[in-house]
Curated annotation (Swiss-Prot):
The gene is KCNQ1. Residues 1-28, 62-84, 620-676 are annotated as: Disordered. Changing residue 127 to L: In LQT1; uncertain significance. Changing residue 243 to P: In LQT1; complete loss of outward potassium current; enhances outward potassium current when co-transfected with wild type; decreases plasma membrane localization. Its main location: membrane. GO terms for cellular component: apical plasma membrane; basolateral part of cell; basolateral plasma membrane; ciliary base; cytoplasm; cytoplasmic vesicle membrane; cytosol; early endosome. Changing residue 619 to M: In LQT1; decreases outward potassium current; decreases plasma membrane localization. It catalyses: K(+)(in) = K(+)(out). Residues 1-120, 177-192, 243-260, 349-676 are cytoplasmic. It comes from Homo sapiens. Belongs to the potassium channel family. KQT (TC 1.A.1.15) subfamily. Kv7.1/KCNQ1 sub-subfamily. Changing residue 569 to E: In LQT1; uncertain significance. This is Potassium voltage-gated channel subfamily KQT member 1.
Amino acid sequence: MAAASSPPRAERKRWGWGRLPGARRGSAGLAKKCPFSLELAEGGPAGGALYAPIAPGAPGPAPPASPAAPAAPPVASDLGPRPPVSLDPRVSIYSTRRPVLARTHVQGRVYNFLERPTGWKCFVYHFAVFLIVLVCLIFSVLSTIEQYAALATGTLFWMEIVLVVFFGTEYVVRLWSAGCRSKYVGLWGRLRFARKPISIIDLIVVVASMVVLCVGSKGQVFATSAIRGIRFLQILRMLHVDRQGGTWRLLGSVVFIHRQELITTLYIGFLGLIFSSYFVYLAEKDAVNESGRVEFGSYADALWWGVVTVTTIGYGDKVPQTWVGKTIASCFSVFAISFFALPAGILGSGFALKVQQKQRQKHFNRQIPAAASLIQTAWRCYAAENPDSSTWKIYIRKAPRSHTLLSPSPKPKKSVVVKKKKFKLDKDNGVTPGEKMLTVPHITCDPPEERRLDHFSVDGYDSSVRKSPTLLEVSMPHFMRTNSFAEDLDLEGETLLTPITHISQLREHHRATIKVIRRMQYFVAKKKFQQARKPYDVRDVIEQYSQGHLNLMVRIKELQRRLDQSIGKPSLFISVSEKSKDRGSNTIGARLNRVEDKVTQLDQRLALITDMLHQLLSLHGGSTPGSGGPPREGGAHITQPCGSGGSVDPELFLPSNTLPTYEQLTVPRRGPDEGS
């Protein structure tokens, strides 16, 4: 019985390719409990049969054999030796262990939490840090007031201890978590991270706080005046709120975009400030106020007055005394104040445009997943008409591993726990079930009862190994009730559906269903893309209409240019000189003009030929008066046709004002008797 239940040698060799090497066989028990290894279900021959240990009698990925041919014994694949499996178990496709939270993974999550915050958890943490820093700053201000100095100083001392420990620990954690990025790996990478401006500020704040706490005595944070000067470094903690520097980047981008306007306004305003201060100084340098003091004793006093005036502050400490100085000050103030107020408007409009641009970018970014889904579904609809096997591989269920066949009883609770953990990881990473692009369902079929194999009974597994039925043969393994009564009731209540594990098991109704599902997914993706393309503001609608009108006008002008180039301008809108210039061009109008000129020349030549023929006829009639026939008016005689008497019939010719026909220009042929 033992020999019958064990697989053959060749088959055991093939199954051994999907297992761990000898150094990792200690995790075999874990592999039986957690069958979550990656499998090549779409690669290799027969849709991944190289790595899937399927029993010869089970409906696995092997293609069905002919009814008359016996089942061939399993043969090891000759695709070459197995690649080395010295990879980490988290990335190796031969590993049977579930991915664990390694050090690099924890580093990445901590780094994203601290340096690239996204989500409500990160917002709560960083907002709490901002509130703590703000409270510390408020107590620092209160410690300089005599009324609250005693209470604020004692409270601030313990707050400083907590903040120093907190920020020091956070700095060390940031330095450690930066190792998840390639440019911050190792000692030199950590030094590169520590050289960042915000990291330098954090280090200065921590060191300054430690110096303040170490030098202070008797619970007094500000023991000496020197330490009181270092205390102002605590204001740098407010920069800790915006570690990413988004506000500074936004301000820099606005200033860079409007740099030309800002430079122009500041330059003109500075010139107005210098000139107004100088002329006021010349007018007020000898003036004395009511207290007997000279207001503008130096040019520096005039510059101070100019800065206070043109910036609309107006302290009133220096005022012009003479009417000349007041007139100069009023004239230059109106001019200079207008230019000094322009940068505020320029920066305000720049910020508004930047915010609007970001909103449009967000609206455009929402269209990218919808467009990707539409392209993917359209391609799948197109690929559904292709009989290639790769089109249908995504609907094939991966074949079970060998340890799932050998397991004594199913464990549905395990799968539920794994699904919950997976959902939790996806939720932590910011992926919600509604944001997934497209789900590919697996196809199952409802086979007859006699085709169902018992994967939970060892006898059923042994019978499938001992006997390899063909397509027409049916294996009837006996079901062994090794489970409890409650589990048997659960198994009886569920409908067992055999998953399709090979392309050859797909039927026409399966393919038709797949086509219908793909077509429905295409229509849904198309509707979502159309909804994402809708403008979100009235200004966008107006801009779209104006942009469309501009494109229409450009196309109309291009069409008009091509028509003028091919047909030419109408004769009513061009002069004689332009007509003469247009004659040498290749337009249709120029060609028609040349054709008309040629027709006119041809008419003139034909008229000349007709006159010459009439003259010849008249001369011929005058030289043969006795040839017979009645004479014409004017002494001309009418001759007989050449066919009878050898003369030309004048009735064949028309008057000189008409064109001759083809018969008139054709010379009559002589008969055979006339030639002789």
